[in-house]
């Protein structure tokens, strides 16, 4: 059975732990769970192949910045998460999470994940954001950010409703099974010959 290591990063309270628990247990936790560091493991079938998926949940709080990278070695794929109802967490993808991941693991693929998709159309959420002259992050904004940070995919999901949840992890596995393209491997595979 092939093993894939997937590390999940993003601001505190964007739903990283709920994402992992909902996926691995099919149950949504009812209360906020502060994470320092945790791992989950599950055996799944993707495209007819048995996979042992090791999921590494990291703390998003600044207090843990100096330790978080210790979970990065041998990572096959990163899920960089932000909450669709939290524009500040979206901006931190550019300001904090992409720089941190690309500094420590420049050749490891990234999937950008917008969490809490169920709240994008929620009236209370929209009103709370409107009071602060904000709005939920749009799909287009997420897609543009994914291109900017060179993510291999942009996906949205809800841990509460599980909409898009399986797709996030199926894509993480598919991405982890594909060796990263470094400039050297791209050059070797190039069909271009200069004479």
From Swiss-Prot:
Keywords linked to the UniProt accession: Cell membrane, GTP-binding, Lipoprotein, Membrane, Methylation, Nucleotide-binding, Prenylation
InterPro entries registered for this protein in UniProt: P-loop_NTPase (IPR027417), Small_GTP-bd (IPR005225), Small_GTPase (IPR001806), Small_GTPase_Rho (IPR003578)
Any matching Pfam family: Ras
GO biological process, one term: establishment or maintenance of cell polarity
UniProt motif Effector region: location: 32-40
Reported phenotype of the disruption mutant: RNAi-mediated knockdown causes distal tip cells (DTC) to make extra turns in approximately 20 percent of animals during the last phase of gonad morphogenesis.
Spans annotated as Disordered: 176-195
Propeptide: 193-195
Residues the record lists as binding GTP: 10-17, 57-61, 115-118
S-geranylgeranyl cysteine-type lipidated residues: 192
Topology class, membrane: Lipid-anchor
Function: During gonad morphogenesis, plays a role in distal tip cell (DTC)-mediated guidance of gonad elongation.
Name listed for the protein in its UniProt record: Ras-related protein rac-2
Species assigned in the record: Caenorhabditis elegans
């Amino acid at each position: 059975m092939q093993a894939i290591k997937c590390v999940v990063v993003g601001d505190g309270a964007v739903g990283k732990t709920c994402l992992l628990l909902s996926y691995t247990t099919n149950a949504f936790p009812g209360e906020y769970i502060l994470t320092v560091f945790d791992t989950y493991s599950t055996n799944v079938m993707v495209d007819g192949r048995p996979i042992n998926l090791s999921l590494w949940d990291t703390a998003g709080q600044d207090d843990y910045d100096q330790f978080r990278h210790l979970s990065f070695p041998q990572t096959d794929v990163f899920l960089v998460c932000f909450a669709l109802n939290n524009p500040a967490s979206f901006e931190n993808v550019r300001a904090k999470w992409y720089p941190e991941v690309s500094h420590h693991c420049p050749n490891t693929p990234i999937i950008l994940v917008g969490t809490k998709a169920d709240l994008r159309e929620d009236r209370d959420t929209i009103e709370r954001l409107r009071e602060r002259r904000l709005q939920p992050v749009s799909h287009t904004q997420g897609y543009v950010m994914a291109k900017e940070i060179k993510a291999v995919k942009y996906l949205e999901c809800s841990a509460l409703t599980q909409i898009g949840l399986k797709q996030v992890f199926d894509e993480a596995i598919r991405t982890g099974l594909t060796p990263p393209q470094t400039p050297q491997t791209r050059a070797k595979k190039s069909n271009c010959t200069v004479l």
